[in-house]
A protein has these predicted regions:
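Feature responds to low-complexity, polar/acidic, surface-exposed segments characteristic
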Residues: 46-75, 88-107, 111-138, 144-168, ...
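Structured interaction patches on ligand/partner-binding surfaces of diverse proteins
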Residues: 22-51, 142, 208
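A glycine-anchored, Pro-Gly-centered beta-turn/N-cap motif
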Residues: 9-12
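Mature N-terminal segment immediately following signal peptide/propeptide cleavage
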Residues: 79-84
């Protein structure tokens, strides 16, 4: 495109000519304990051939979801992931925080958290994931990287609501696959319903609990087969 990469610094203004045939693209960043969030740039086209833009600090980023007011308990977690480009809404102005999270939606969030380029992932082993489905490249990315194995050798159940124990398994595998160290600082807890946790999910649940990624329900249970809501998923991923 003729332009060089630029290292932006706070407090420094940069001017670059942009014609109407050109465009600028926001490349989302990741907000976690070890990676600093990138800046978001707004591009305002003027009447002439020049354009102006400014760096917007994370706190200034417009938050569009009217169903997630600042008073809602999950607001800071949802906003953190939204600012980082990890999550999007069900519509332009709603997030549906209390709705159940589907398996396809969750792997999409994991890909966003990783900052993965899923454009090359177009085919997969799951017969219930059409190649032209919006979630197909995300599911394929997750499968090829060992984050998910599916509900069977050939099925993923993308539209099914994800259970809390399956969420734990995906997050645990995600951490393993991408070298995310899970701490062990939190004392181990035996959930009141530990016996209800499937054998395949128990190691993941225990590891995430010791890492402080999950803490269970207020009554001391984990409710492994209960569905995870969209806001609960944001709380989990913001802890990574």
């Amino acid at each position: 495109d003729g332009y060089s990469d630029i290292a932006f610094r706070p407090g420094i203004w940069y001017v670059m000519p942009v014609t109407r045939a050109d465009h600028m693209q926001f490349v989302g960043g990741i907000a976690n304990k070890s990676i600093v969030q990138t800046h978001l740039f707004y591009l305002d086209l003027m009447d002439d051939i020049y354009s102006t833009y400014r760096a917007v600090q994370p706190g200034e980023t417009p938050f569009p979801f009217t169903d997630v007011p600042e008073s809602r308990w999950s607001y800071p977690y949802i906003k953190q992931l939204y600012d980082a480009g990890v999550v999007s809404g069900m519509t332009a102005t709603t997030f549906a925080p209390a709705e159940n999270m589907t398996r396809a939606q969750f792997v999409t969030m994991l890909a966003g958290l990783q900052g993965a380029d899923v454009s090359a992932y177009r085919t997969g082993k799951f017969t219930d994931v059409p190649a032209d489905a919006w979630y197909a490249p995300y599911v394929s990315w997750a499968a090829e990287n060992g984050v998910v194995y599916g509900v069977s050798d050939t099925a993923f159940a993308p539209g099914a609501d994800i259970s809390r124990q399956d969420m734990a398994v995906m997050v645990y595998r995600y951490a393993e696959c991408f070298g995310i160290r899970l701490g062990t600082d939190v004392p181990p807890v035996t959930f009141a319903d530990t016996g209800d946790i499937a054998a395949y999910a128990l190691p993941a649940v225990q590891a995430l609990q010791r890492a402080g990624v999950i803490s269970g329900m207020p009554d001391g249970s984990f409710r492994p087969r209960e569905h995870m809501t969209r806001e609960q998923a944001c709380v989990v991923l913001s802890a990574l």
